[in-house]
């Protein structure tokens, strides 16, 4: 204690001397230092500055939502889609702020049983000493007392090794990060959607979904009843949009149903909202009951982010919460109770199996610092990725009853990676792959998602960045086995790289072959475990330490072939050094790997990653708002937009070259089924609201017209005082209501398309180009009054009697045709041919059909005429003109100067971050 007081006094005395401060802090015993990620008493100034910048962008997103709500006459039908966009971006900015405040991490990841254990053990211990963990005043050996025994994959949570103090509560030194309610939902849904063959999934009928929603409506309170809010539910929706976009269960929940779930769930009791969540796993009873049990356990603690337990939670290690097998008791007694407490004072006793299921991370404080980079870096050990099953979904309840543990285990392991990826926790990754064929086919996509988020989705984006991905080829000594029929030649090494890189990581992904322009990925390392005896390769002393190779001649031959292999030269930055490191006695490659790891274990790397993503985020946000801001310099705005439009046009032609243009148009159009469901829900809502206007018949009549007719009776009388004219309000009849809803639904769909992660790769267009495309189509729809045109046509078409079936079908057909025609022709089909934009060197008018032969007999040439190519060019030219007309139209519009100034202020703030 005295030493601590002296050290703190020294710290105060040298507060103005940074280096002296560091020395003084280092002199304070670890157990007296505050926990960095909780108390934040000595935050890194740069990290905190970046976090505040992220917070400012999140605040700007909220400001944009408020502006959208006030500017309904400007954003019109696009308002709901824009508001959802900015809600998503605001959540993303908050996650980046949290990431900036947390320490950087090196993650060890890979499929199950890939030799990760030796790598973790070696990185987490000081040379020559066992890994020792501090729990308050007690010490435990990690391998001796905590880590489960056996050669099987054993963990079902993330293990964090840190040298920062991990301070629990009195008598409860075991500190855990907990799952949230929506985490539980994601895990259950992941288990169902990944482990049941989607071809056997029969989606829930719309009547079943509607019945569940109606039941929830009847039980919903007027306001939220707990911590859950609509942002949590929106984040849940975004999870399914990202990972299960085309799964039948997700598709069955049309956007309208999802929006109701977002609104209803926070206002329901736990039991009622978990029942509503059951729609995400096809109402499988056992899965719903298990989800309810886990959510209720979290509710006892008031849904904490962190909780503390006594040593009982990890001892004895055969029953520890770190051992995933402990979770196998779920539904089978659930195990003995374990006390759990939160820093807010909540306490509960949770069954051991339940506690194991709801813990996301176990935090372990290392007694000894293994490497100097642990001063600012934590080591994360992820449970091994597992292959997924293909159960018959028709037997979902039967499978859930008999195999609940494995379902939950696979779902949780997969989701934990996704959660930490979303939270930007994985600054660097050590990807471990062994020599045999890889069976966990989901790993390449998981790695690719991380690369896209941390380094960039293209070789150009990754250029100039520190490489934070380390490909670790484990079990190097297995390469020296003499295999029947296999020769010790150069091709031997291509076979190894084939199983890990070419036919696994590179299958469907181009980053291994081109990490940066013109250069393949080459941050590859060998790793060998000296603790596993290989007497066919090495000789050992009496203590089991390696002393020499048994056949140096063969080792030299294999090394020569390795160095001569062209694939090796591509994928190893320094093949000879990698070989020598892997063959180093009693080391196996750890020394070389840690040496290369040290430079990227730098807080500046994480800041660059977060700053890069924040800049992209701010740029996207500004891009979505710019179309609504009226610039004082119309010529400059026109030049800027014209340049953007031409860039999009070129990418549209690249999309056409990839034969994806037709699919792009389809994504930009609206589906008739979607509008039919929308119309059905609108009719149901109208039926439940006695005052609702339900008849889309005739034309809309305004109060102004009625007053005009009435006053005409009294033209000879003195003119009365002119009444104050009321502003025309929003939709007045069913035609207006449905037209507005249909256009809003279409706009939300194309905004969702622009936000999808797979869109750039599928359509050969970058994210900014797709966002511009969507924004300008929306602006064109407003300018050309697409909603009003649909409503007018509905009134015209419905102005005569017809069957009930046609009355229900026709509005959908009208809206679908109008929206999809707009996407196809952008309004230029209604323009006289001579007034249309010109395309091609010959200056032909766009979208002109070739003249029909006089005798109705087509003239066929020897080579087919490329009508599709002409259409692609016409569409790109039409888009450029659409953008120009949008700018000119905005320039002549009436402007609310106060609203426009507020929008300009938001844009200025975002542009500063986007630089």
Show the residue positions of the predicted features.
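Active-site neighborhood of phospho(di)ester-bond hydrolases with catalytic His/Asp-centered motifs
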Residues: 472
